[in-house]
């Protein structure tokens, strides 16, 4: 399974590594779970609609979401 970060999501990931290690741990748990079961599991996965149809989101915390798309053998974040 290959993770592909868009520029903005990679910048966010690097930001959280500097600011909040607990949040990075949660993001890593979500990514690991997504690679096993992309459409169910932790973080309350839900499909997005309209402009983001085909994408899914999972809760990092009450305010932040991890948005991703599963295509072929890639997880686009």
What is the predicted function of each stretch?
Residues 67:
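Short, surface-exposed charged micro-motifs
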Residues 1-62, 70-76:
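Basic, Lys/Arg-enriched alpha-helical interface segments
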């Amino acid at each position: 399974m290959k993770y592909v970060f868009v520029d903005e999501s990679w910048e966010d990931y690097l930001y959280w590594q500097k600011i909040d290690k607990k949040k990075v741990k949660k993001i890593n748990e979500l990514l690991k779970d997504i690679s096993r079961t992309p459409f169910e599991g932790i973080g309350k996965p839900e499909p997005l609609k309209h402009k983001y149809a085909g994408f899914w989101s999972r809760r990092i915390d009450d305010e932040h979401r991890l948005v991703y798309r599963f295509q072929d053998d890639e997880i686009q974040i």
